[in-house]
């Protein structure tokens, strides 16, 4: 069957059911207890060496036995037979001096399996059987030395592996294989050689078969033998585009589960697993019975991990039979829709997504850029050269660039030697490698040494399209990303226009002709030196910065890199000024979208730390702001050079040692100076009442400064790494004193609290924690966005008595269900508490409680927490408490099952026919006075205070009543007054001391409605759609009203009316988390919660203020509006500002569209979690509608037809749609 046809057929099968791979071939052969004569058969009776153990030879010497084993597995229910060729490569066959038989063995093995499979397909045509031609790992490793005394030595080369695998692949295809299975991969470089061979043979034969890949996690470390994590391994081989990616061998199902689970999450293709029958016992035998193994498989299948399942060592046809029984009828894993990202790896993964921070590529392992490194390589001092690479990684390099291009070096040999040595150093090889050379043969030699997914630096069009395409195809086959220089046959691009022209041409060739993934294309638009004295060079930096923005906008998913030090080449010898130029240049490049840069990771200056006079002079040069900018910088550079060489005393370098100790500590943290940290920390400890105060005070203050600079793009990862190192030294000095002062006492119990993965909200959780602590419970608070794995791991390690989960947004409900299921699966016997704004007793009873056999208690407020915990941990109270709980939940479930919608549901067609009736012909939408994006940075807190709605503030503290009446309430009035005063005192401090920062933005875009959705355009020509905002429509019977949808309030495209829509995002919480943590560390939980509550109020106030400003000034459709704050709270204005996740648009992922439209994260630092919660937590976002008839409404329940329509418009499968629409889907 042709390759394309077989792929289609197998994919159809995989979409419908879980397919079964066969089990252990070696296990079955061992059951025959063959002796030497059996292996020889008749043909090899006179062979000159022992053949016992050569199982692959049996296809020639005992073919009937292999046929019988295949038959047994197909009879048991297997869909896919593996050929008996695990060790049939020439390399593995060399152990028996049988290299010459490799081709014949592969051919005969495939032919035999083909005959058996066809026989069974003929028996049961509705269940076709397939043959997977097996390519095993060989008995050698391409990335590990077999000689402990020479870590750079290899007993097999990439090319030798390619040759061996090519011969086997040709024979397997000729013998009739339907698929190629690269399995039991313990060294990913071997597998990369194998995949290279397979793809080369496909090209040679003009046929492409589906490829299956299966790796081996060797032990509890969760890594392959060559050291890669599961995700790093996946990233390294993802370029093969296999039909399935899986794991097999080494571990039993219990040990392998977490890695199969991880693979099912990250793999864009189908997932396979064929584990061993447990771990071998003391006699090397496997004890896990077919029934027990099937139990594990059933759980994997029901958890949605699997598309293919089979067995490896110790498994038999009976194991496969039992697996077939438990997976029959179970829905196979659905392929996830993952964001487009460049997925690199060393021993560990590096995923570069749209929202990733700047990636630092270490430049010092380059003989052309580092005199020290060049000397070490020339003198063959490779151990010392490795230390240069390690320093780069320790200083924050996430990728290391390696270049050996020097006239007196054998660049190819040096590259191979150094990369092989790097592979033996986990602290270096954990990061991806950038193979850098101007010589193609050196690049190829380097690619043959790296097991992860690296980057080629670089190729270009300078020698024409044909060579460019040839090299790009090979790079893709080697499994690397590529840097493309802006260079063609005319020359290097030196202007903005030329940079765009060349990069666009290269992009189109790579994507359209080569099939290169756009996310793996990294453009280097050429960084040239500025301030050279030549006028034509003055705009080089500006051209690069602007080209970065152009490329990011016009070439989807492509990334930008560059050699940063080039820009300062005119000032070589004056490192101080060079570092200042780098800091300023990077700051502006990063703001415009530059993804990565080749830098000296140990010597990056912080933008804000560049002296103001120097920074201004540098910016004049970089941004070409003055005609005399070069001369001015040269003048000031001389002064800084003299300081650097000691001719002029730099007083500022000495002054800081005379500052107060708190300021000295901050300075050391920001600058990454370790020289004085111990003596300054000791001085601070002597001055403090308690040693812990040194950490909570000056050390945390300094780290907050580092965090702010990093978040603002004025400080890069290497500096943060150095700051963290300084902090660790300070804490290490204090730890003995802190431990000596600790007192331990008895508690009422230990409770773990966590806000679940993807959710950032924790005010309620923090209040619960404080209340419980006041009642002598020990609290372990894991904070926000905590994964299930972390929660359960810590719960076991700390031996807690209760686990409490919190969440505010609706996606958190599914995560809570997941945690409950995992607790049941792992055999926990602890009570589980559920709380948070999005939770309810009904959801707890219907969705969570039934997945966990221990008590699951919905706690609706902090006041209940103590009573609940006391009952659950009391032997006397627990039985009756749990009995009442069970009765209550059963009642809730019965009520839920009988629950009928208050209004009758209607079809989507009927709902759309009853849309809001607006006479668009007689209405002209208002045109904004100031369209586009508006940013409000460090906004004045005093202004926002006038817009605060205080009623929800009191609700946070469980004081119910409307402001201002609550201040006079008979029962809670006095407490409310105290709270109100404390909040305003804190706001005074916030305002005076700048404790919190408020940032916000809004934008107004041309828009039209198209059905239930809204098209947002890039500009007023309305020709290009920037984004589509998807909406839901009410879907219940409305005899006297409309079935509302937000799109009803935007003029339909066909009306010819030019309408607009707005978006906004605001936060009052920048700095809030740090303040709250500081208060907590100081034991001040009251103010920790207070600062969060105040930050939330500021965010809502900012939203109110900004909406008013939009109505009156920016959009300007209500210029004469005069409303009091009470009127604003009552929404007496024209227009609405609905927010994704709330009743009118309850689906959270639409926040992502807003973020992209307005470039929110880069503009004001607000980000979204995996569940689309906003960070910081004290944040608000939404849309602006201006129509006078617009109003708020609730979508409530929708039906399956609308869910299908929404999924189709969003490009989702129904699994994804059900995940996000679940709370509203009837």
Curated annotation (Swiss-Prot):
Family: Belongs to the vitamin-B12 dependent methionine synthase family.
Binding site for Zn(2+): 249, 312-313
GO biological process: homocysteine metabolic process; methylation; tetrahydrofolate metabolic process
Record bears the keyword Acetylation: no
Gene designation per UniProt: metH
Cellular component aspect of the GO annotation: cytosol
TM segment ranges: none
Residues the entry annotates as binding S-adenosyl-L-methionine: 949, 1137, 1192-1193
B12-binding N-terminal domain mapped to chain residues: 652-746
Cofactor(s) this protein requires: methylcob(III)alamin; Zn(2+)
Catalytic activity: (6S)-5-methyl-5,6,7,8-tetrahydrofolate + L-homocysteine = (6S)-5,6,7,8-tetrahydrofolate + L-methionine
Pathway: Amino-acid biosynthesis; L-methionine biosynthesis via de novo pathway; L-methionine from L-homocysteine (MetH route): step 1/1
Sequence ranges assigned to domain AdoMet activation in this UniProt record: 899-1226
Function statement: Catalyzes the transfer of a methyl group from methyl-cobalamin to homocysteine, yielding enzyme-bound cob(I)alamin and methionine. Subsequently, remethylates the cofactor using methyltetrahydrofolate.
Enzyme class: transferase
A GO molecular function held by the record: zinc ion binding
Pfam families: B12-binding (PF02310), B12-binding_2 (PF02607), Met_synt_B12 (PF02965), Pterin_bind (PF00809), S-methyl_trans (PF02574)
Domain notes from UniProt: Modular enzyme with four functionally distinct domains. The isolated Hcy-binding domain catalyzes methyl transfer from free methylcobalamin to homocysteine. The Hcy-binding domain in association with the pterin-binding domain catalyzes the methylation of cob(I)alamin by methyltetrahydrofolate and the methylation of homocysteine. The B12-binding domain binds the cofactor. The AdoMet activation domain binds S-adenosyl-L-methionine. Under aerobic conditions cob(I)alamin can be converted to inactive cob(II)alamin.
PANTHER family, alphabetized: METHIONINE SYNTHASE (PTHR45833:SF1)
Note, other: L-homocysteine is bound via the zinc atom.
Residues that, per the record, bind methylcob(III)alamin: 696, 758-762, 806, 810, 862
Organism field: Aliivibrio fischeri
Cofactor annotation remark: Binds 1 zinc ion per subunit.
Annotated ranges, domain B12-binding: 748-883
Protein name: Methionine synthase
Every Hcy-binding domain range: 7-327
